């Protein structure tokens, strides 16, 4: 009997199944790894966005801290303590308080790094804080340190003439030949149509910014010329501290009246002011002259001179305010102090004085020839130059409610040669 050859069928299911199971395992492992990687990327993106936003907020706080410290420096803050306190307070108001929630704030004067490391007019603020991560903790990164740095400094303002009044004509030149020429910027705060009225005179500044509009000859070094519609600027000397005094050193009950002769006056409080006339020659010794009522009046071809002097014009108690009038051919040589609380300030009017029509205008007139070095600060009263006088100096700065130049008068303003720069300062971010 013949039997056929038997061939067994291969066991297909087991071998292929093992291979398929292995492949599925590899896919699952790859998928799991990819999912972890994707989660890590998502977590990294989320944490990066979170920390970027947080650093932006911290940078805002650092900027505010540096600016506040520099502003305190501009105001003459005594010692680093006041500057540090101002910077810390500004940072806290922006959500970052020193030694709270792991926040550290460092304030350096001068900055500890960067371009201004040797300049004591700059303040550096550094804020650091360690923050927990949102998602990166699954990869072992539990926290990250965020930091922000800013540097702000005190710089010279580019402006040296301010007409602060916000109504009517703030700056005017009246009469042919009258001019105001400033080797610096001019600011006119009035929003009136005739805020700057050059009339038949001329006004020039390196820049001219007018809240309202102007008429007549107005020019500047800027390509755009005299600018209009500019927002009003604050009083640039608002931080200047008023001199303190009590009682009367001179002039009570009778005002100090110098009529002729050669006289030397000493600093102190002059109740009822100072009046000089009849060709007198007066020398003011260095220091601060408090004019409590009565003001300062010089006339009759008199001569006045003084170096390192400041005149503070006020009216307290029973004394009535009087303006500053230099008229009648006065010949004057007056220089402001170069150091101390009133450095760079020649005339300083009490800000609380309320102007009265016809009684509060400060006048320099009558062919007076004056050489001044210092700042004329009359924030609430008017300042008028007229009568063909020539007013010039190494530097002069004018801040008044209104400023008028008339009667063939030439008025120059410049602070370029002043050793410590413009007494009017501004605070700006530098780094």
Positions of PLM-derived features:
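Feature marks extracellular polysaccharide-active and adherence modules
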Residues: 164, 187-189, 199, 206, ...
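Short, ordered "entry" segments at domain starts
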Residues: 129-247, 356-399, 403-408
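N-terminal leader/signal peptides at the extreme start of proteins
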Residues: 1-24, 29
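Short, low-complexity, Pro/Ser/Thr/Gly-rich segments in the mature regions of secreted, periplasmic
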Residues: 242-258, 415-431
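N-terminal single-pass transmembrane signal-anchor helix
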Residues: 19-50
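Sequence/structural signature of small/polar-enriched beta-strand/turn repeats
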Residues: 203, 210-215, 221-233, 295-355, ...
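Short amphipathic secondary-structure patches
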Residues: 2-9, 13, 52, 56, ...
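Solenoid scaffold repeats with emphasis on beta-solenoid/beta-helix
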Residues: 171, 178-181, 194-197, 201-203, ...
């Amino acid at each position: 009997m013949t039997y056929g050859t038997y061939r067994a069928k291969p066991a297909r299911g087991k071998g292929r199944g093992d291979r398929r199971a292995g492949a599925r395992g590899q896919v699952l492992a790859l998928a799991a790894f990819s999912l972890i990687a994707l989660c890590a990327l998502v977590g990294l993106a989320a944490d990066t966005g979170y920390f970027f936003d947080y650093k932006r907020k911290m940078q805002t706080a650092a900027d505010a801290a540096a600016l506040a410290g520099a502003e305190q420096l501009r105001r003459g803050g005594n010692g680093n303590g006041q500057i540090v306190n101002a910077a810390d307070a500004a940072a806290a108001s922006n959500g970052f308080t020193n030694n709270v929630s792991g926040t550290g704030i460092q304030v350096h004067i001068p900055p500890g790094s960067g371009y201004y490391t040797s300049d004591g007019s700059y303040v550096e603020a550094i804020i650091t804080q360690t923050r927990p991560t949102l998602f990166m903790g699954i990869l072992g990164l539990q926290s990250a340190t965020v930091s922000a740095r800013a540097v702000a400094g005190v710089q010279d303002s580019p402006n040296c003439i301010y007409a602060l009044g916000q109504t009517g004509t703030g700056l005017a030149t009246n009469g042919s030949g009258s001019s105001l020429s400033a080797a610096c910027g001019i600011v006119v705060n009035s929003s009136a149509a005739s805020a700057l009225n050059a009339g038949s005179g001329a006004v020039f500044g390196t820049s001219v910014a007018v809240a309202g509009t102007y008429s007549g000859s107005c020019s500047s070094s800027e390509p755009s010329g005299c600018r209009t519609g500019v927002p009003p600027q604050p009083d640039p000397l608002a931080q200047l501290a008023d001199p303190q005094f009590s009682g009367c050193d001179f002039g009570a009950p009778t005002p100090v009246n110098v009529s002729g002769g050669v006289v030397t006056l000493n600093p102190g409080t002059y109740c009822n002011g100072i009046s000089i006339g009849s060709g007198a020659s007066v020398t003011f010794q260095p220091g601060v002259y408090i004019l409590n009522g009565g003001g300062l009046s010089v006339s009759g071809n008199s001569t006045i001179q003084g170096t390192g002097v400041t005149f503070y014009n006020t009216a307290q108690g029973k004394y009535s305010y009087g303006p500053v009038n230099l008229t009648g051919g006065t010949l004057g040589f007056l220089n402001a102090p170069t150091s101390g609380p009133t450095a760079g300030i020649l005339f300083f009017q009490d800000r609380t004085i309320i102007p009265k029509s016809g009684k509060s205008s400060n006048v320099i007139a009558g062919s007076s020839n004056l050489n001044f070095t210092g700042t004329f600060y009359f924030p609430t009263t008017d300042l008028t130059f007229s009568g063909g006088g020539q007013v010039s100096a190494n530097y002069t700065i004018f801040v008044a409610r209104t400023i008028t130049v008339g009667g063939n008068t030439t008025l120059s303003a410049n602070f370029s040669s002043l050793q410590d720069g413009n007494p009017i300062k501004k605070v700006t971010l530098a780094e």
